Design a protein with these regions (language model features):
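Membrane-interface alpha helices of multi-pass inner-membrane proteins
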Residues: 184-208, 312-319, 357-362
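Primarily membrane-embedded glycan-assembly and transfer machineries that use lipid-linked glycans
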Residues: 2-185, 207-334, 339-341, 393-398
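Membrane-embedded alpha-helical segments of transport systems
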Residues: 195-198, 225-230, 351-353
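Aromatic-enriched
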Residues: 339-398
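General helical secondary-structure elements
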Residues: 11, 192, 280, 382-383
Length: 398
């Protein structure tokens, strides 16, 4: 099989213009002002009565407190975990934020719970946002990468609930950025990514298909070490509770109609439009299979590594049926690799506009909640495929 090429001209010697820099800076300031205004109105970090704001972060902090109290398995018990969330904020509230993470992430939660809720929330973002921003800057290879990273609308989408999208993006982007030069370290980052295993499904397939066994071995070793450490720290009971919770994850996230417009996957889109579960799984499975085949074949070709990395990162978002708006900060990773390619060889006509459109789709979720993230990911994936097919010297895949 051959991934073909064509001769579409690219704009030579692209330079980031001053107006673009100012625009990105303005977007960064706008997001910061939005968060500060939300804080002042009692919509972020702190509620109007001075208690902690109930967002996704209370899930992590409460689970960490249960660990510190000597009851790690209770994080998977909805009744006990909900009581811990109420205690964390000092008041009862209607929503519940369930704990679905593997036991190793309880180690992180327990550290965060060592300080009060609101400072822990702020510290979590203060640590993870720079990790994400430095990763995007490293991928792009230019100081403007910081502005691009922080101007991306996925930043505010992750900051509002205090979620872990920055961590996932930093681990995935860091692994791909280091894979050619530091395979063992890249594998270690992939191993750490198993704290959200549904975003790492493509990695073992791609690594095996392309014969990157050193990365594969490192990722496997770190995954096993994390599992062993959490087993030693929390015992078999916690792992058993986690395994039992897996069936609840699919039942809650993928069968309740109220969730469909919040999830940015092919499965959720079909269900939101009224399609049956069988049709939704069929279409999602088709997209998943096509993505896996294309990305694996691409990684076996002589395509530029930046395009391989971009395809894997975008593919990771397409194949999971379970992806929320805060996870879409990960989309900055494939976008960063495309920007890197554009910086060195010029951007294709419409490429910058496509990246901007994908960003605006994610931002639109604030005003009109819908699966815009899927459309944004599809745009970026299309830009990557276009790049692959116009880039010269891609060897046939046998």
């Amino acid at each position: 099989m051959t991934i073909g090429t064509s001769s579409v001209a690219v704009a030579p010697d692209f330079r980031f213009a001053r107006p673009l820099e100012l625009t990105l800076f303005a977007l960064c300031v706008a997001q910061a002002v939005f968060l500060l205004a939300s804080f002042a109105d009692g919509l972020w970090l702190m509620a109007p009565d001075g208690s902690g704001k109930d967002t996704d972060f209370v899930n992590v902090w409460a689970a960490g407190q249960l660990v510190r109290d000597g009851h790690p398995a209770a994080a998977f018990d909805w009744t006990l975990h909900k009581a811990a969330q109420n205690a964390a904020l000092g008041r009862a509230f209607e929503s519940y934020y369930p704990w679905f993470y593997p036991p190793p992430f309880l180690l992180v939660a327990s550290v965060l719970a060592a300080v009060p809720y609101a400072p822990a929330f702020a510290a979590w973002l203060a640590i993870t946002l720079p990790a994400y921003a430095f990763t995007i800057r490293a991928i792009i290879g230019h100081r403007l990468g910081f502005l691009l990273a922080c101007a991306f609308p996925g930043v505010v989408m992750n900051a509002l609930p205090g979620q872990n999208g920055y961590v996932t993006a930093a681990l995935m982007g860091g692994a791909l950025h280091l894979m050619e030069r530091r395979p063992a370290l890249a594998g270690a980052l992939i191993g750490l990514l198993t704290y959200k295993p549904h975003f790492g499904l493509l990695f073992p397939l791609v690594l095996a298909a392309s014969g990157r066994w050193r990365v594969f071995a490192s990722a496997t070793l770190v995954t096993m070490l994390m599992a062993a450490l959490s087993y030693a720290a929390f015992g078999a009971e916690t792992w058993e509770a986690f395994i039992r919770s897996l069936s609840v994850v699919s039942k809650v996230a993928l069968t309740q109609e109220s969730h469909f417009r919040k999830i940015h996957s092919v499965f959720a889109l079909v269900r939101a439009l009224g399609g049956g579960e069988g049709l939704a799984w069929t279409l999602h499975g088709t997209v998943m299979a096509a993505t896996v085949v294309y990305v694996c074949l691409l990684w076996c070709s002589r395509a530029p590594f930046e395009l391989k990395a971009a395809a894997l990162a975008a593919g990771a978002l397409l194949i999971t049926p379970y992806i929320y708006i805060y996870d879409l900060v990960i989309l900055a990773v494939p976008m960063a690799f495309l920007v890197r390619v554009g910086r060195t060889g010029g951007f294709l006509p419409g490429e910058v506009a496509g990246l901007a459109a994908a960003s605006l789709l994610i931002l639109s979720f604030l005003g009109f909640p819908a699966p815009w993230g899927l459309a944004a990911t599809a745009i970026v994936a299309a830009l990557i495929i276009r790049r692959v097919h116009v880039t010269p010297a891609i060897a046939p895949i046998s």
